[in-house]
Amino acid sequence: MSQGHGKYDFYIGLGLAMSSSIFIGGSFILKKKGLLRLARKGSTRAGQGGHAYLKEWLWWAGLLSMGAGEVANFAAYAFAPATLVTPLGALSVLVSAILSSYFLNERLNLHGKIGCLLSILGSTVMVIHAPKEEEIETLNEMSHKLGDPGFVVFATLVVIVSLILIFVVGPRHGQTNILVYITICSVIGAVSVSCAKGLGIAIKELFAGKPVLQHPLTWILLLSLIVCVSTQINYLNRALDIFNTSIVTPIYYVFFTTSVITCSAILFKEWQDMPVDDVIGTLSGFFTIIVGIFLLHAFKDVSFSLSSLPVSFRKDEKAVNGSLSSMYEVLNNNEESLTCGIEQHTAENISRRNGNLTAF
């Protein structure tokens, strides 16, 4: 792959990844509104295993929006490294957070806005330092990578962990612990990204006139992708139905991105030939995104905005002045009471003495 062609593919993948984030961020809002409408109608909720959302057009609109985003995301993996494409999902967090504040009445405070800004800055840093060229260009190379012992161990662990979460942990703690369903989506999502990457390579070879449809790996990747995406949709719906959208979206991003970067490092070894400064820059960008996501999530219930900064200061100042005034009044009252008591006591003693003298 020539350097010019590699950069051209890089920017195509970048544009597709950004458009994907916009579609996916909007899909969370549409699907959540559909689920809320069903809840008001008294239908069995998705978090309780219900599937009434299949009759709700808003949910289908959200699904189509997510589908468009996933198609763009799928295409992006064919042109750019997973280390670049996946972290740009932070834009979907930004889109979802802003739209949820307008359409779902989920407030976005100052901490959330700073978190969104940090997510964008972190994504920018990752784009700058991400690897610009792909090293896998054929299905045969992909097949060789999938047979690597490191990836086989990773895939086996993903399957085991997913089965335990789905059949053991999920029924017990899925309704109360947000991490259960999101972890299922994330670890399975790492495998789906690998499948999407392989299918993207297959499609590029198909347009080049190669007989990829006769390659067994093409159909294995397609079947695996369908199973993984179906599972992701199911458990993501449950998480969205039970928990706040502004919580689900950022946590899902962090878990999903971490899983994909780990899978990409094991399978594609994209980090192997990266300079040290690019590795440090990529990790710094990713941790910056995590800090932004934390601010967006941890302080979501705090009613705090930029305009409230001087107001709160004035309130504190008034409170201090008020407490000092109250203390001063109490001291004055006590002093007056003490003075009155002494005077009254003195008067009584004088009157008693006068009475005694009169008796004599």
Curated annotation (Swiss-Prot):
Annotated S-S bridges: none
Biological process annotations from GO: magnesium ion transport
Residues spanning the membrane: 10-30, 57-77, 79-99, 108-128, 150-170, 176-196, 216-236, 247-267, 279-299
Reaction(s) this enzyme catalyzes, per UniProt: Mg(2+)(in) = Mg(2+)(out)
Cellular compartment(s): Cell membrane; Early endosome
Function: Acts as a selective Mg(2+) transporter.
Family affiliation: Belongs to the NIPA family.
Protein name: Magnesium transporter NIPA2
Lineage: Eukaryota, Metazoa, Chordata, Craniata, Vertebrata
Gene (UniProt): NIPA2
